[in-house]
């Protein structure tokens, strides 16, 4: 099911497309009407998913119907404490809008509800939705997922992913940029990032051409805005009811940064600067001439006058990129009753990632201030990291705390994530401690946590017990330190997940 959006004229973020007709969810006639008319009611056994809407895992259709034992559960208000969301597997939706493992996903959602999880995070990939040709969007698989989450009683956070996933076509989790974008990059390689050695990085389009019509007459910012606008129009019945938050991708891994080595490197400032495509170099030359700075081809001395100028320009370019996307997203989702999220990297080589941090300068403060200006929530990963487990010259735990302090200083709502999905008891406790570190320093705290991510191992008995206990502890952390008893739900969920662990693949 492909949806062609109305045409747009101009770059202005205030120009909104006409409302897309209601046909995007015509495939789900019962859902299309129930989203608007839904009222919490007494639970009863109801068959709500027919084989037409949710065929079995084999994809053969058949006549089998899936019944939720208690019918559509009422969506409760925000739980006390810190809400926990769970990010779905990367390959949940495949090419052509195919939802994989539907039957297992239904059982998984039931288990999450029983454990007290608030909702799920759904990554919506640009390369899948607008993959075939520009301006043609296929949301079918994601519509199914959101509908399933609604009927299971889960809320949804949508992550609009404008970046590449995986290392290449041989990677089982490989999702490239849209094919038509890759064709344009093949014609003009400078659309992609490049370091001083000419090595290209195709994770994300170079921000040097943000406002240039390099994508078949549209600029990258226009393409991102059109995608967000079509998402809003397609999912309007769910926004503010089921979909409560939208994270907007701003760079590699969805984070507002340049491509950069991860924290696996020994030093914080290593990594090559990603500014050697012709568009970035043209901007650098123009800024240098305007500032009266003598150009230097090799930025070897970052402490010198040119080095300081270069780092300010490099970080300002990143901030301007974030500003453009924030402006578009705020305009598009202004009346949608969802909060918008931006993500930063906390476990990267700071200077090459675009975070100009020194002993007297905090590179995260300008970003947090920008997010606060637009009412965005700030997302940061690595909440489970303990320095005792790290052998590096710079504290990785300190990275995360630096981001949290910036959010606290700017009074920005916070969303935490783990970077390693295999968490032990100490790691879960560190997540709680890190969450409290932010929470205790904010006058009107707003915090939630995304567990990254759902997998077969998550539902193994010992891991599931550990996870459900973590969710319970997170629910107990609030201003009044309420002590809530979720024991019954947790015990029920243990037995209901053994089959999921076996079926997941």
Task: Enumerate the predicted regions with their spans.
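Polysaccharide-binding and catalytic clefts of secreted carbohydrate-active enzymes
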Residues: 182-369, 376
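Short, acidic/polar
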Residues: 94-113, 356-367, 396-400, 434
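Aromatic-lined substrate-binding rim segments of carbohydrate-active enzymes
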Residues: 102-202, 222-244, 264-268, 332
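N-terminal carbohydrate-binding accessory modules
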Residues: 37-114
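Hydrophobic faces of well-ordered beta-strands that scaffold small-molecule active sites
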Residues: 82-88, 118-122, 156-160, 244-248, ...
């Amino acid at each position: 099911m492909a949806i062609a959006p109305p045409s747009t004229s101009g770059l202005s973020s205030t120009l909104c497309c006409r409302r897309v007709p209601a046909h995007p969810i015509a495939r789900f006639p019962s859902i299309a009407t129930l989203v608007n008319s839904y009222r919490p009611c007494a639970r009863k056994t109801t068959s709500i998913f027919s084989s037409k809407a949710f065929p079995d895992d084999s994809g053969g259709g058949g006549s089998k119907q899936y019944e939720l034992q208690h019918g559509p559960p009422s969506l409760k208000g925000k739980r006390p404490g810190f809400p926990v969301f769970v990010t779905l597997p990367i390959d949940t939706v495949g090419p052509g809008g195919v939802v994989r493992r539907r039957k297992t996903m239904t059982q998984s959602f039931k288990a999450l509800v029983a454990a007290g999880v608030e909702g799920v995070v759904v990554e919506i990939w640009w390369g899948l939705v607008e993959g075939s040709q520009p301006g043609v969007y296929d949301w079918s698989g994601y519509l199914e997922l959101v509908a399933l989450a609604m009927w299971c009683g889960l809320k949804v956070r949508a992550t609009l992913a404008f970046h590449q996933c995986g290392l290449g076509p041989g990677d089982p989790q490989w999702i490239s940029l849209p094919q038509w974008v890759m064709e344009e990059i093949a014609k003009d390689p400078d659309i992609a990032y490049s370091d001083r050695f000419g090595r290209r990085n195709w994770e994300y389009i170079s921000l040097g051409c943000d406002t240039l019509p390099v994508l078949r007459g549209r600029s990258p910012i226009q393409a991102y805005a059109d995608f967000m606008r079509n998402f809003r129009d397609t999912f309007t019945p769910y926004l503010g009811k089921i979909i409560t938050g939208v994270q907007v991708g701003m760079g590699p891994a969805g984070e507002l940064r340049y491509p950069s080595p991860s924290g696996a490197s020994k030093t914080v400032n290593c990594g090559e600067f990603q500014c050697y495509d012709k568009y970035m170099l043209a901007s650098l030359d123009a800024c240098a001439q305007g500032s009266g700075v003598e150009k230097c081809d090799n930025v070897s001395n970052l402490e010198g006058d040119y080095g300081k100028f270069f780092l300010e320009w490099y970080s300002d370019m990143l901030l301007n990129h974030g500003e453009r996307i924030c402006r578009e997203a705020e305009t598009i989702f202004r009346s949608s009753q969802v909060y918008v999220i931006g993500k930063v990297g906390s476990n990267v080589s700071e200077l090459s990632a675009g975070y100009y941090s020194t002993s007297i300068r905090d590179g995260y403060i300008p970003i947090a201030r920008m997010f606060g200006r637009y009412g965005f929530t700030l997302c940061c990963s690595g909440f489970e990291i303990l320095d005792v487990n790290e052998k590096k010259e710079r504290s990785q735990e300190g990275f995360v705390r630096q981001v949290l302090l910036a959010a606290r200083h700017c009074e920005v709502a916070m969303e935490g994530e783990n970077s390693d999905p295999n968490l032990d008891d100490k790691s879960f406790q560190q997540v709680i401690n890190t969450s409290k570190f932010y929470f205790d320093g904010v006058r009107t705290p707003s915090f939630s946590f995304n567990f990254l991510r759902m997998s077969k191992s998550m539902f193994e008995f010992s891991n599931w017990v550990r996870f459900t206990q973590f969710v319970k502890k997170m629910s107990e952390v609030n201003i009044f330190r309420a002590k809530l008893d979720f024991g019954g739900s947790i015990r029920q969920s243990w037995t209901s997940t053994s089959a999921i662990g076996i079926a997941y693949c």
